[in-house]
Amino acid sequence: MQYTELVPGTLIRRYKRFLADVALASGDVVVAHCPNTGSMRAVDVPGCRVWLSPSRNPARKLAWTWELIELPMPDAPPALVSVHTGRANALVAQALQEARIPELAGYDTHKREVRVADARLDFRLSTAHAAAYVEVKQVTLREHDGHGYFPDSVSERGRRHLEALAARVAEGDRAVLLFCVAHTGIDAVAPAAHLDPAYAETLRRVAAQGVEVLAYGMSATWTHDGVPGDIALTRALPVSLERRLASATPLSD
């Protein structure tokens, strides 16, 4: 997925979930839309460099959207993190189209936002004789042990999606939970039992019932001017359903 224009700034604060104050290089402070309803635990770090996309729509209330943040990493360059949850499905759609996820290759059609019973799942992949349902979850929380965890707060909606996937398996379809790891510093994923034990337990149960769990990590390319130019899912990552964090203290609060 390619960005057409990004402007750097420094995060001052995020507030009211959907708003962020950002200082631009000019010294101006702007209010940007924060397209992330989650807790953004260990990601909402004041003082870090962020990247904003501008809107050319004069009718829009906020002219800026917060897209990315660079987070410090121990003994490594900063990690790039996509905070825009709406980009996760776009990254997965591109990866499916380009056959970058071998486990989900070979399907003729990719339909998005599919209603099943009382839930909506992100993708239905199909051939003439088989179907696979895929639910995408964006992972941005990197805890102090170096692993990525989902969810970053209690998620009843996430549990409902797991039950919907299990119901598809019971009907004879294939069902997949796909973690879209939008943090270049994460190399493995686990359910966040320290934040939402019910979600972790539900995930282990539905996995035992046949729901597949995959994780793919984001990579980024940069322009000659030092601006993020493209992000894509390129890295298959291991998932440990039994892992438990010894301490719930993240790299940053």
UniProtKB/Swiss-Prot annotation:
InterPro entries: SfsA, SfsA_C, SfsA_N. Pfam families: SfsA, SfsA_N. It comes from the Bacteria. Coiled coil: none annotated. One of its GO terms (molecular function) is DNA binding. NCBIfam families: sfsA. PANTHER family: SUGAR FERMENTATION STIMULATION PROTEIN A (PTHR30545:SF2). HAMAP family: SfsA (MF_00095). Belongs to the SfsA family. This is Sugar fermentation stimulation protein homolog. It comes from Chromohalobacter salexigens (strain ATCC BAA-138 / DSM 3043 / CIP 106854 / NCIMB 13768 / 1H11). The gene is sfsA.
